[in-house]
Regions:
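Extracellular/periplasmic, surface-exposed regions of secreted and cell-surface proteins
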Residues: 103-112, 117-122, 130-131, 137, ...
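Glycine-rich, aromatic-lined ligand/substrate-binding cores of catalytic
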Residues: 204, 604-637
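Conserved small-residue
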Residues: 1-32, 130-131, 135, 398, ...
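Extended hydrophobic/aromatic segments used for targeting, binding, or gating
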Residues: 78-119, 266, 645
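Acidic, glycine-rich flexible loop segments
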Residues: 14-41, 55, 134, 138-166, ...
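Extracytoplasmic gating/loop element in the C-terminal half of outer-membrane beta-barrel translocons
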Residues: 10, 14-19, 174, 241, ...
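Predominantly transmembrane beta-strands of Gram-negative outer membrane beta-barrel pores used
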Residues: 55-85, 101-105, 192, 197, ...
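Residues embedded in well-ordered regular secondary structure
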Residues: 1-84, 267-268, 657-662, 677-678
Length: 766
């Protein structure tokens, strides 16, 4: 009813005839004809209110003085929360995993230790064969209109009939029901072997270690496609191409079949992954009275096969050297120096290796005589560090993998065709994809940290305070100011500077009163980055530039309000404004609204301020803990699904707030959204602060209640511990966004919803 009212109002506001007839509007209001004029809640029809999850884990450890072992096995079974309306198969988002790990440590001699570790997992994911990624699947569900069909009636898929409904006949079942299903099985194996040899006979405290690791993955995807018949409801009197039984009611609703149920087809695909890692190191630790020294020299190398890139057949390799020296005097004065020397395939031989040093120091004041044995201050340490790290990876925006061999031109790119000469036919061919840059080198990040660690009141209160500053330079990026028209992509350059600074606070209170122990942990962090330099097209309007703003800062138009007759100083909007249309600010005062009026609006999608609070207690076998997390100074730019009522094609869904918050003559003083219109969509739904929403939230992330049993029979059977518990995840959320999960940085688009999980469990140890 709201949808029909809104759409009719939009057409009326634009001086056009309403789309829905009075009969249809009244039927929606009264629900008097739910087959011809349905009002379907697709979320209720498609989703269960809950789905089961089962998890188990078994750990076994033991051994002798020289041989020790640890074995772990686990399983996880998660059922999807889609309702299965097609009983021919299960098309839900189910997930099943079995994981295992076995560790074996052997002391071959008093100075020789061999560690053999093996682990892995087997996973199976079941999914509906919709042909879309998960976001697009949920986007289509959001798009479904309530009158596009009644859904499943008497086991039949009933779709809306355009004879009676003028728009919006893509229903919520269309992209998931009767289309088949798929399953992906993944098998991952992780192996590593480490040998540690003490070399005290060379010099005391010296040891040599060598480690090799091998990881392998294989996946097999099976897809089974099919189709299913659907039906359209008709009044019998409108089915003029068929004969009807004598005396039948002309207003009776009959179903006319559309399509046939198809056979299930089969397709499969395979994937694989493989990588190895090796390192060799000398490690030395030695004490000379109150002087404590250590040193490390390490070589590492890795290779990844079948990487996600333009060259999956060429393995990706890394090689590096690491050095570290530490010194402390009487656990009072501490200093550490590190160096890294790493090589990457992405740079030319002259720039392939990067040198990355770091140094840190600390002073434990409570080791000094003036603070030692202080009744209030149990521990106090100040520290500082400075270091440089490197990055060699460039991820083009919108791609799922990183570019490789950035110093070389991409040799070719298969094109869809080219028209040679005067002919009109397309000829296949290849062309150079992008330039290389032989002068490219490592992106660098210089990091500083200054902190204080403390413990007070007999260690009841402890915590740390940190200030950090980071400056990224030589950022890997492509130029955006080159005015020349190129036939291929520009090369990656060392282009860009970004700074980041912030503070972190961690506080812990832990106290015991007789049998009652309680604790609380608080952590708060604030960080803000800024683009110091970015290759931008120069503009006389500095407020349009990204330089000086955080990375990912949204830009758009500032909103003055909604238009009303007699409104003064209104710039040209390239559209004749009507009452209830959005009016934007003309920031450059040139009398027109365009991209030169766009400025920074809202915050980036990542929060600037994060916080977490843990509370808990233990008392005579009972234990309780809960974790609250929150964030603020973060925004989401709503995409078309959440922004535009009726969508781009004017026949998609209408969200409830888009109806209740719209401008009307009666709500002009309180309206939050523009009037219902079709003609004014281009103006009203431009990128502006109207569609940047506060994504601050407070969430009860985790809560756990448990009880440890101490029963007489337990020692008799070798049972050391038995605990029952209940845990809950994502139980409560307080936020202003409402339409999606505020904790997800992509919550401005439709996505698989966050799950509220409640577990009951038993933990037994022997």
């Amino acid at each position: 009813y709201d949808y029909a009212t809104f759409l009719n109002e939009a057409y009326t506001n634009d001086g056009k005839d309403p789309k829905f007839t009075p009969e249809a509007v009244e039927a929606f209001r009264t629900h008097s004809n739910p087959i011809i004029y349905p009002d379907t809640d697709w979320m209720e029809l498609l989703f269960k209110s809950s789905a089961p999850q089962t998890q188990g884990n078994v750990n076994i450890s033991g051994g002798t003085e020289r041989v020790r072992y640890f074995i772990s096995m686990g399983m996880l079974d998660q059922k999807g929360f889609f309702k299965n309306h097609d009983t021919r198969y299960d098309a839900n988002f189910n997930f099943n995993r079995y994981n295992y790990r076995a560790n074996l440590d052997i002391d071959f001699t008093k100075t020789t230790l061999v560690a053999i570790n093996m682990g892995g997992r087997v996973e199976k994911r079941n999914f509906p064969r919709s042909g879309d990624d998960i976001n697009q699947l949920f986007r289509r569900i959001y798009w479904a209109t309530p009158f596009s069909g009644p859904g499943i009636v008497d086991g039949k898929w009933i779709k809306g009939n355009s004879q009676y409904l003028p728009v919006g006949l893509s229903d919520g079942l269309g992209n998931i029901y009767g289309r088949g299903y798929g399953s992906k099985t993944t098998n991952v194996v992780n192996l590593d072997l480490a040998l540690t040899q003490k070399l005290d006979f060379v010099t005391k405290g010296l040891q040599f270690k060598i480690k090799v690791a091998y990881n392998s993955g294989y996946d097999h995807t099976k897809e089974r496609a099919t189709s299913i018949e659907s039906y359209q409801p008709w009044y019998r009197k409108d089915v003029t191409w068929m004969e009807h039984p004598a005396g039948s009611d002309p207003n009776e609703v009959v179903y006319i079949q559309d399509g046939e149920a198809g056979l299930i087809s089969y397709a499969e695909s395979f994937g694989k992954s493989r990588d190895w890692y090796a390192e060799a190191s000398f490690d030395w630790k030695r004490d000379f009275g109150l002087h404590h020294l250590s040193a490390l020299a390490l070589y590492n190398q890795s290779k990844t096969y079948y990487p996600d890139s333009d060259y999956p057949g060429i393995p990706r390799g890394y090689v590096g050297l690491v050095g570290r020296v530490t010194y402390d005097y009487d656990n009072k004065y501490l200093i550490e120096g590190n160096v890294g020397y790493n090589g990457s395939e992405n740079f030319a031989p002259g720039n392939r290796y990067g040198f990355f040093p770091a140094v840190s120091g600390g002073w434990v004041l409570t080791q000094e005589e003036f603070l030692k044995d202080n009744p209030v201050v149990n521990f106090l340490k100040i520290r500082a560090s400075y270091g440089i790290v490197g990055n060699d990876r460039y991820h083009p925006y919108g791609t799922g993998f990183m570019d490789r061999f950035l110093y070389l031109p991409n040799s070719y790119f298969i094109g869809s065709g080219y028209q040679f000469g005067t002919g009109t036919s397309w000829s296949p061919g290849a062309y150079e994809k992008s330039f290389g840059n032989s002068g490219l080198s490592w992106e660098k990040s210089a990091k500083q940290n200054y902190g204080i660690d403390f413990s007070l009141f007999n260690q009841k209160l402890s915590g740390s305070i940190d200030y950090f500053y980071e400056k990224r330079t030589d950022i890997l990026a492509k130029a955006s100011t080159d005015p020349i028209i190129h036939a291929m992509s520009l090369p990656v350059l060392n282009l860009g500077i970004v700074s980041n600074k912030g503070v972190e606070l961690n506080l812990k209170w832990n106290h015991k009163i007789n049998s009652f122990r309680y604790w609380t942990n608080l952590n708060v962090s604030y960080a803000k980055n800024k683009i110091v330099y970015q290759d931008e097209v120069p503009s006389e309007y500095t407020y349009t530039l990204k330089t000086g703003h955080p990375v990912g800062q949204p830009f758009g138009l500032k909103v003055r309000g909604f238009y009303y007759e007699g409104m003064e100083d209104v710039a040209d909007h390239s559209y004749v404004l009507k009452e209830g249309d959005v009016v934007y600010e003309d920031l450059n005062h040139d009398g027109k609204i365009d991209d030169n009026d766009k400025t920074a609006i809202g915050y980036p999608s990542y929060p600037l301020l994060n916080a977490g609070l843990t509370l808990g207690f233990e008392y005579k076998g009972f234990d309780f803990s809960m974790l609250w997390v929150g964030a603020t100074k973060t925004s989401r730019v709503l995409e078309e699904t959440f922004r535009k009522p009726l969508g781009e094609t004017y026949d998609r869904s209408l969200m409830s707030h888009q109806f209740t918050d719209r401008w009307t003559p009666e709500t002009a003083a309180t309206a939050k959204l523009p009037r219902a219109t079709i003609d004014g969509v281009k103006n009203n739904y431009r990128d502006s602060e109207l569609w940047v929403k506060d994504a601050s939230y407070l969430r009860l992330k985790n809560i756990e209640i448990g009880y440890n049993f101490r029963l007489p029979f337990m020692p008799k059977i070798g049972m050391e511990k038995m605990r029952v518990f209940m845990t809950g995840y994502n139980l409560l959320t307080f936020d202003k966004l409402k339409i999606s999960d505020p904790e997800s940085m992509s919550s401005g688009v439709p996505q698989y919803p966050v799950m509220r999980v409640i577990n009951f469990g038993l933990n037994v140890s022997f």
